[in-house]
Amino acid sequence: MQRLCVYVLIFALALAAFSEASWKPRSQQPDAPLGTGANRDLELPWLEQQGPASHHRRQLGPQGPPHLVADPSKKQGPWLEEEEEAYGWMDFGRRSAEDEN
């Protein structure tokens, strides 16, 4: 019996944690500032497509359209070379092959 109660409690907590339901209708929610100037015009249509956001998502703020989010795998610039130099000492296999040639 105790095991069943623990499972039900864990299920209820998980459901509450992952729930995206909004407790208030959209008309009663306070309007959060979205930004200023041109950024606000860009964010509004994308945010309206997403529907009502959860409490936690509203606390984080607008994320913006996916095409405006930076992709860390496409790094360019001088910092890439600095990172390669900083982590070069870990590349034992390549260094061994270069030393033998």
From Swiss-Prot:
Family classification: Belongs to the gastrin/cholecystokinin family.
Q: According to the UniProt entry, which residues carry Sulfotyrosine? A: Y87
* Protein's name according to its UniProt entry: Gastrin
The protein's job, in short, is: Gastrin stimulates the stomach mucosa to produce and secrete hydrochloric acid and the pancreas to secrete its digestive enzymes. It also stimulates smooth muscle contraction and increases blood circulation and water secretion in the stomach and intestine.
Record-level GO cellular component terms: extracellular region; extracellular space
- Native source species: Homo sapiens (Human)
What residues bear Phenylalanine amide in this entry?
A: F92
User: Which residues does the record list as Phosphoserine (modified residue)?
Assistant: S96
Q: Which Pfam families does the record match to this protein?
A: Gastrin (PF00918)
